[in-house]
């Protein structure tokens, strides 16, 4: 899964730098307009990989070798107590991180932008839940190919456009 979504994450970081002129997150609060206005293709790519990162269908890959283990809990079947707790907490920390990146697309110098970003993050999270409940699993090969294709087209085109801007 990591090999599928990481190229888009790297392209997102490059696009944020090209659009804001800095890797400092505080710079987005100095912009005159939301950064999504210049890197909207990257945003679409990040939406695509967010489904992979949140482990939602169709990209919630099976991690166990036996069907009965997958029914129980997948790769966390043999975990319990503090170990399982740490895995679950870190999964939610990753969710907050990625949803925070979604919110960064909608921040600018206007204080209202924080409210706009929060509303959009909630809408995106509910979209992910809807996708999870309405699509069947795909094989890992399809996930890998489609994620790299989206990263190449959405991220690559947007980064190339910003390079010549």
Annotated model-derived regions:
Residues 1-165:
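Alpha-helical transmembrane segments of multi-pass membrane proteins predominantly involved
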